[in-house]
């Protein structure tokens, strides 16, 4: 399963990538610090699963998720409990 990590916090990206790489059926294709460039990456690469931070500068994770192809799975990551219901 091809994955992307999108999070504005460097330590969160590093931690998620280390965790995901422990599972042989998951392959991290890339990491992004914000939503910029993700749409273009998705046009050129087959991505099955996004680990997506909600609170990021510019386009937030919820806005980005609304633009994704329906078949793309999303696991939202956030430090803010107020986003739990909306995500």
What is the role of each PLM region?
Residues 12-14, 84:
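Charged phosphotransfer/docking patches of two-component systems
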Residues 12, 21, 57:
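The feature encodes the CheY-like receiver
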Residues 23-29:
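A generic structural motif
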Residues 29-38:
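Conserved Asp/Asn-Gly motif in the active-site loop of CheY-like receiver
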Residues 18-23, 41:
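Alpha-helical interaction/dimerization surfaces of two-component signaling modules
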Residues 40-41, 45-87:
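CheY-like receiver
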Residues 1-3:
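Extreme N-terminal starter segment of soluble prokaryotic enzymes
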Residues 6-7, 32, 50, 77:
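Conserved sequence signature across two-component system core domains
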